[in-house]
Amino acid sequence: MRILITGATGLVGNELVKLLLAKGHTIHYLTTSKDKIEAESNYIGFFWNPQEGKIDENCIFEVDAIIHLAGANIAKRWTNAYKQEIIESRTLSAELLFNLVKKHPNHQIKQIISASGTAIYPESIDEIYDETTKETEDSFLSNVVKKWEASVNVFQVLGIKVCKLRTGIVLSKKGGALPEMVKPIKLGFGSAMGSGKQIQSWIHINDLVALYNFALEKRLDGVYNAVTTNPISNEVLSKTIAKTLKKSIWLPNTPEFVMKLILGEMSYLLFSSKNLSANKILDLGFQFQFPDIEKAIDDLYQ
């Protein structure tokens, strides 16, 4: 299969490219840096600039599927300008791809798989939400998810299947939230956040890239929660990390107002509680390699 990937050099993209190449697929990837363009037989780069509406049209030649991972990092301080970048880096890129595919009706693209977020779901500790949930949260990130998904849904009018993976906290040693949680615990200053009771729906990086591959092979359509079967509290996550690192957590929980002073509105990421179901993807036969938090953290840090 020939697959076009946006965000191929990001945390998830890097690992996904490795897996897809190992399975014999050919990768086309889009980059905003002309000096990062490679042209190997099975890994070919193409220039684009979504802000300026520029894209090398050859990128979709003989492509069977698109995987859309591009998007500015949400773990940075949310100034008004950066909020706009968070939205546009996801939506303008999808719109540029849509217009390109629409311009070439003889394309052979059958599916687009897009990253998405769990922020769209209501806050919850006890109630478990699944993909049929109509109620949504009223927050900046929830609105990002709505605009993000709307920007890829338009591919349906071209007869292309649209699969959206609403991704929880991605556990990886190479980036994302986990290394930031590990740092203070390693130094002996770790603590749970707020009440510590907020639920974190998470997924190991290996399971996430396997899920993208599963969605590709099964040519999935619709929304799926990319989270493991066992959501946990922030307190349990903190204690599990400490146990694996052979450290203890002795400090009192960090109050929410302190983190708001330090991080601003972005502190939402630490205190948000999303209790989500993975049943929809399980019912299709997907199997998690790391369903339990202890095994996931041990795999990454032992």
Language-model features, listed with the residues they occupy:
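NAD(P)-dependent short-chain dehydrogenase/reductase
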Residues: 153-156, 161-164, 168-199, 241
